[in-house]
Amino acid sequence: MGIGKGSAKRTTIILDEEEREFIDKLIREGKEPGIKPLISKMLDIYRSMMIYDWRFPGEYYCGISRIVFLNVELVNILVHNIPKEKWREVGRKMGEASKVYIEATLGIRATDLEKWLEVFKRLRVQGFGDFYVKDKYIMIKAPFIGEPEIWAGFLEGLLGVELDIKTFTAPFVFEIKQAKHNVG
């Protein structure tokens, strides 16, 4: 029986009692539909977050960048101690730094419109929010930073565009005014 390009292979793993109880609890509570989907999800996260490069515990790398698990409350403290008139500029610098990381890690140009879905998938995997493009608009659902000025600057620095903010509460909508250099 073929699945994809290869055929399925049965694998047996032996779990400690505590591990099996944890998995059974997840399934019982409806958090996971079964063992196979759970393992598939774990492998997807392992690959996409490059966990094989982590120096566990406490030192995590995803490509060329060190990443941390940080409470949104701590990010909000940082944000709200930056003068509001600097938010767009700070966001732009964050976007430029993310552009370097994404281009080096994924091997794609973040300013290439055809690669934006890959860029947005990476941001979603890392917890930035859910990003959508429709015509000349970019929308962010569930952003981890609640200030559209920062996001406008971030996307401008990352994608090489100029944006107008259309909504000031999440989900954020930005209109693409001008693409600076979005060619492959």
PLM regions: where:
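Short, basic amphipathic alpha-helical segments that act as recognition/interaction helices
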Residues: 22, 33-59
